[in-house]
Amino acid sequence: MIIKCIAVDDEPLALDIIKDYISQVPFLKLIKTFNDGISVLEYLASNNVDLIFLDIEMGGLSGTQLLKTLQKKPKVIMTTAYRNYAVDAFDLDVTDYLLKPFSFERFLKAVEKSCNSLNEAQNDHNQPKSDKDYFFVKSGYKILKVNFDDI
């Protein structure tokens, strides 16, 4: 499975490190990089990605503000130099939180977590749905039909 990703950071050096790390992971495909949140919103309005590497502190629209505005959220790995945003980030359902500077090993662990989450979501989506909206229960000598809506 190839994971399409974008990277967002207003610091060129941090973006270069993320790009280098992504290039070392064969199942990651970097689609585009951004240095501000507004450009990301415009891009995501007409493009789909599986994973975003997202800085928090950026001029204009912050990473957390960006996440709050997204209707359909891809998996997100926060990349930041600030510890104090971790709780807020996890409240926004990010997959992981990388504290700069982070090692390739730590980066890879976050990517694997995102990959597992994406695989689980895909497997759930591919599971056949039951067309029954009820089940049977034996009660004494009787078999009762119970509707899911009645539970």
Place the predicted regions along the sequence by residue.
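Conserved acidic segment of CheY-like receiver
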Residues: 2-13, 18, 22, 52
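Hydrophobic/aromatic residues located in beta-strands of well-ordered beta-sheets
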Residues: 5, 30-31, 76
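Short beta-to-alpha connector loops in regulatory alpha/beta signaling domains
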Residues: 9, 29-35
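CheY-like receiver
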Residues: 13, 24, 37-125
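Conserved RecA-like P-loop NTPase ATPase core
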Residues: 18, 86, 151
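Glycine-centered tight turns that cap/initiate beta-strands
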Residues: 27-30, 150
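Conserved binding/recognition cores within well-folded domains
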Residues: 112-151
